[in-house]
Design a protein with these regions (language model features):
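Short helix-capping/linker segments at secondary-structure and domain boundaries
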Residues: 107, 208-219, 321-330
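Short acidic, glycine/proline-rich loop/turn micro-motifs
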Residues: 122-126
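Short, conserved secondary-structure transition motifs
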Residues: 120, 159-165, 253-261
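Catalytic-loop motifs flanking and including active-site residues across diverse enzymes
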Residues: 95, 196-199, 230, 283, ...
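N-terminal catalytic cores of NTP/NDP-binding nucleotidyl/phosphoryl-transfer enzymes
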Residues: 46-119, 221-225
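Divalent-metal (Mg2+/Mn2+/Ca2+)-assisted nucleotide/phosphate chemistry catalytic cores
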Residues: 129-247
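Non-catalytic terminal extensions that flank enzyme cores
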Residues: 1-82, 153, 235-288, 292-304, ...
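Core alpha/beta catalytic barrel or barrel-like domain that forms the active/cofactor pocket
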Residues: 109-117, 121, 154-158, 201-202
Length: 383
């Protein structure tokens, strides 16, 4: 990187300290404003989920138009996905929790993509096909355990759903020149051809309901801002294929427990994230050792307060574990004022994390009974 203000954000690499407003301007997206949040609240009702209310989701493409259409009787569906390279960590759940909230509030269908093929092609650690498939099933079960409706939730498990996806994928692939994929993703000559074709596969769920039903059905994709380039390609070809452009809702990257500006990828620096298969003692150790914004001494922190904005424990509260905005404000102000010391803050968040792990384990056992029934295996139209 050329300087301290340099950062890189692509679907395959995130590094540096990200200037999110600068990134949003570079990508040409719109900010999530208080007026837009009020529109979401008006249409969906109920309290906004933490990640939306507290600014983690900060950027969008065409969300107001999609919401206006829904308010006027035009249905839409949700789409999000997971590349199964290992166990999920808690920050992976942000986009799926938001999708579950939209599904519960609005009764819309949810399409999940498990990209076991892409992780096999892109794995730097040499994941085998068996490993990506097995992790895909494990990840899918964790996702469904968040409370998705079995009757309104469908899964594209790429290697097992290829018969359902391929008729549309070949049509999409014909519309995307190699020069576009190379320019958007920076593919080097050594890149395998699987990843070149993957852009077509990742676009399939965004168009599939419209193609399957023969009518225009808009799509909302909550995703990390790093995934925007994939879906810019999808949006560029949508109207030419007779489909609506997918709307996007972008989140910031969640900081890691060790003080990194972004969360580590699965399998990299295991202490940087809380994995859903971590035993309780491991969760305790990771949180107790997490980077904070505290001062050098208790006396200094009581006098000057701490800095929550750089604290990885505060990020846990902000993203998931402060159930109410009142609790989040209490934690934030206690930290800044020096009333709440880091040890007590960690104890409080650990109580909530362990409670979540227990409830998630019970929900996961139930979801395992129906997870495979969500996988789509046949196309609604012939090749």
């Amino acid at each position: 990187m050329a300087g301290n203000d340099e950062f890189v954000v692509t679907p395959y690499e995130v590094k540096g300290r990200i200037d999110y407003e600068r990134l949003r301007e570079q990508f040409g997206t719109q900010p999530v404003t208080p007026e837009l949040l009020a529109k979401v609240h008006h249409i969906a009702g109920g309290d906004l989920p933490p990640a939306l209310a507290r600014g983690i989701y900060y950027s969008h493409r065409d969300l107001p138009a999609l919401l206006d259409g829904f308010a006027n009787g035009k249905p839409f569906f949700l789409y999000s996905g997971r590349g199964p390279s290992g166990p999920l960590h808690t920050s992976h759940l942000l986009q799926f929790s938001l999708c579950q909230w939209f599904q519960k509030r609005l009764g819309v269908p949810m399409y999940i993509q498990i990209t076991d093929d892409e992780k096999f092609w892109s794995s730097k650690s040499g994941l085998s096909r068996d490993e990506t498939v097995q992790w895909g099933l494990e990840n899918l079960t964790d996702i469904l355990a968040l409370g998705f409706d079995p009757k309104r939730t469908f899964t594209f498990f790429d290697s097992r759903s290829i018969a359902a996806m391929y008729p549309l994928a070949v049509r999409i692939a014909r519309k995307i020149p190699y020069s576009t994929v190379k320019a958007v993703f920076g593919f080097e000559p050594s890149m395998n051809i699987g990843l070149v074709f993957y852009t077509a596969l990742q676009t399939v769920p965004a168009f599939w309901p419209s193609w399957a039903e023969g009518r225009s059905i808009p799509c909302l994709i909550p995703c990390g801002i790093d995934q925007d380039p994939h879906f810019r390609v999808s949006r560029d070809i949508a109207e030419g294929m007779g489909f609506p452009k997918p709307a996007l809702l972008h989140s910031q990257m969640v900081p890691g427990l060790l003080g990194d500006s972004v969360m580590s990828t699965t399998g990299d620096r295991a202490d940087n994230a809380l994995f859903l298969n971590d035993p309780p003692e491991t969760v305790d150790r990771k949180v107790r050792n997490a980077f904070t914004g505290g001062r050098a001494t208790v006396e200094e922190q009581r006098r000057l307060g701490a800095n929550p904005e750089i604290c990885s424990v505060w990020a846990l509260w902000r993203t998931q574990f402060a159930e109410t905005n009142a609790k989040f404000s209490e934690i934030t102000e206690g930290c800044r004022s020096g009333r709440l010391l880091c040890g007590e803050c960690k104890s409080q968040v650990l109580e909530r994390i362990h409670r979540f792990y227990r409830s998630h384990a019970a929900a996961r056992a139930q979801a395992a009974e129906w997870a495979e029934s969500t996988i789509l295996t046949s196309a609604p139209r012939p090749l």
